[in-house]
Design a protein with these regions (language model features):
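Fe(II)/2-oxoglutarate oxygenase catalytic core
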Residues: 1-82, 86-140
Length: 140
């Protein structure tokens, strides 16, 4: 089985600018989900896919943890996480709650970007038509 995902990120409003974030010793982020409900979404639509790139490696702490998936990822320079926060109906996936554990030693530097739904029309042309909600991924 192969997995292919393609998102449009170049047109205005398709995604946020890249953010570089630093967490020093003890730095962390509490459990949250990268999602805005349709009632509160910004222009550009719902956040559908966060990208988190690790710019530094850590020996102690700083893991990104998804409690609902039983998944913990240690920061390793040059690696990245990418996940979907919603289905094509823009309903959030509760398994995508995550947190950044406290940094034990050193500095955790990450690069983040959020991709929004409204600019994905050509990636998923039937996603919002008459309740037709296919998967965001094409599997073969």
């Amino acid at each position: 089985m192969s997995l292919f995902i393609c998102f449009c990120c170049q047109e205005p409003g398709a995604s946020d600018e890249y953010n570089i974030i630093n967490y020093g010793i003890g730095g962390q982020i509490e459990v949250h989900v990268d999602y805005w409900s349709p009632e509160n979404k910004r222009s550009g639509g719902a956040r559908v896919a966060p990208f988190l790139g690790y710019l530094t490696s850590l020996q102690h702490g700083g893991m990104t943890v998804f409690p609902g998936l039983g998944l913990a990822v240690s920061p390793e320079a040059g690696s990245a996480l990418f996940w979907l926060t919603v289905n094509t109906a823009e309903d959030y996936d509760s398994r995508m709650y995550h947190m950044g554990c406290p940094v034990g030693r050193g500095n955790k530097w990450v690069l983040s970007k959020w991709i929004y739904s409204d600019s994905q029309m050509w990636s998923f042309p039937c996603a919002r038509r008459e309740g037709n909600y296919p998967s965001f991924t094409n599997q073969s």
